[in-house]
Design a protein with these regions (language model features):
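Nucleotidyltransferase catalytic core that binds NTPs
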Residues: 1-231
């Protein structure tokens, strides 16, 4: 799951490394595995409505990279896992960043459930599911945050430790520390504002696709105009 607005080097590294870890599991058969890039409608809302052009740009870019894209209206991860469990009883893997995992352990997302957070986590982790966690760099301290040192709400700490110590959360240990400061929202802002430098934040070939298809509001004249002013 991601915003993919646009897809970045971080997104693809997270995917590639999580896939390697998933396939190394003896319970996983690679030929029977389906990889899906999911975008939730909850992350496509702009000023209270769906921005269709923005949504299509994200999906088109991922599809051009050969990926399968699924659009859902599941804001909570447990609903997503519950949906997939209708089609398979085999092991499932979720690749995500630290920030998203911390959100999973936020009680406010489960207030509408009669069983609260316990019901949600029962649905999420009852299935044969494993989370592959990509690290986060603290921009203030420079500290690399992993499953070992991330902080959840005190009331959720023991629940988190339970899933961590039972092997349901695995750290992605192979990563490029030089790209941890790349964020989709920053790249998107640079594209819209006609700034230079966003191309290096994206996987090889992605910048050319954005330029050729004028995705995410890319405007060649705006970019060229910015360069002339700088000169």
């Amino acid at each position: 799951r991601g915003s993919y607005r646009p897809v970045t080097r971080v997104n693809m590294e997270m995917y590639e490394e999580a896939k390697k870890m998933f396939f190394s599991d003896k319970r996983v058969t690679e030929k029977n595995t389906h990889v899906i890039f999911e975008i939730t409608l909850a992350n496509l809302r702009s000023e209270g409505k769906i921005n269709e052009r923005d949504f299509l740009d994200r999906a088109e870019l991922l599809c051009s990279l050969g990926q399968t894209v699924m659009i859902t209206n599941f804001q909570e991860y447990y609903k997503l896992v519950d949906y997939f469990s209708e089609f398979t009883k085999a092991r499932m893997g979720l690749a995500m960043g630290v920030y998203n995992l911390i959100q999973i352990f936020d009680e406010k997302y489960y207030r509408d459930l009669s069983g609260g957070v316990l019901e949600a986590f029962g649905k999420l982790f009852y299935k044969d599911l494993k989370v592959y966690l990509y690290p986060l760099k603290d921009m203030e301290t420079g500290e690399i945050i992993t499953s070992a040192n991330l902080k959840v709400h005190p009331r959720m700490k023991e629940l988190y430790k339970y899933f961590k110590f039972n092997g349901r959360i695995a750290d992605i240990t192979k990563f490029d520390p030089d790209i941890l400061e790349i964020f989709s929202r920053k790249a998107f802002k640079m594209i819209v504002n006609g700034e230079d430098g966003w191309e290096e934040m994206l996987p090889e070939g992605v910048a050319n696709i954005i330029k050729d298809k004028r995705l995410f509001g890319y405007n060649r004249r705006r970019h060229e105009g910015k360069r002339k002013k700088v000169k």
